[in-house]
Amino acid sequence: MRFRGLDLNLLVALDALMTERKLTAAARRINLSQPAMSAAIARLRTYFGDELFSMQGRELIPTPRAEALAPAVRDALLHIQLSVIAWDPLNPAQSDRRFRIILSDFMILVFFARIVERVAREAPGVSFELLPLDDDPHELLRRGDVDFLIFPDVFMSSAHPKAKLFDEALVCVGCPTNKKLLGNISFETYMSMGHVAAQFGREMKPSVEQWLLLEHGFNRRIELVVPGFTLIPRLLSGTNRIATLPLRLVKYFEQTIPLRIVTSPLPPLFFTEAIQWPALHNTDPGNIWLREILLQEASRIDPQSDTC
């Protein structure tokens, strides 16, 4: 199909190239052979009068013209999908759909494991691709490259719908051999002790507890930074360091790692875990189905009684 001399199939190829940044992967994404994808690039270059991509090693580097075209092309394809091509109804028992979800290691352990278990029973052909926290998850959401974000609602965009999962408390924790934790600790002691903290993505963005503490004006002495919450409990063992962690994560690790929760001198710290999905997928039957499962399972999580 052509529109003003442009084969619209070439826009699908351009979108795949911008997403994958590798020729073979882009060709595989839209079920083309590598020679056919190379031919599509040549035709795109002719139509737009621009090189569009250069090769650096095996990676395709887009030109400014390609970067400028990419958002409009992706939005146009998404609107065609939603406005012209109807969403397929979902039969969970027979579906082979794959959902891509960005979430933290903490949420995989304490929440998403129960989703995997339930879906395995109700929709055995459905699969998941669980992705680490990205430097720009909202761009992935806008492009429809992920089905859900699952993380604290304070980090979520106002441009897409979202729903609350549950509230989470943050607690102060350390190794039971740490003599400074035998009783209540003062604010000065808390601030002077070495802390272990998680940061995420290539830009090392702060985790929710660090964000909340900075919002209160508390700048801790962080001695060890790791790329995820689940690494922290083991790294506290045998040291005098402390961490401020989600309570459910501490309860999970208490079964295998000696940990001590201490009364914090800080005001109680809480955050809300939530889900967010692309606005353009709001009426997608598959998205609605999984959304309902996520909310149902969240409602079954025991409320917390402990606080910092």
Swiss-Prot record:
Superkingdom of origin: Bacteria
InterPro entries (UniProt xref): LysR-type_TF, LysR_subst-bd, NodD_PBP2, Tscrpt_reg_HTH_LysR, WH-like_DNA-bd_sf, WH_DNA-bd_sf
Organism: Rhizobium meliloti (strain 1021)
SUPFAM superfamilies, sorted: Periplasmic binding protein-like II (SSF53850), Winged helix' DNA-binding domain (SSF46785)
The protein, known as: Nodulation protein D 1
Ranges of the DNA-binding region feature: 23-42
GO molecular function, one term: transcription cis-regulatory region binding
A Pfam family of this chain: HTH_1
Keyword presence, Lyase: no
Function: NodD regulates the expression of the nodABCFE genes which encode other nodulation proteins. NodD is also a negative regulator of its own expression. Binds flavonoids as inducers.
Gene name of the encoded protein: nodD1
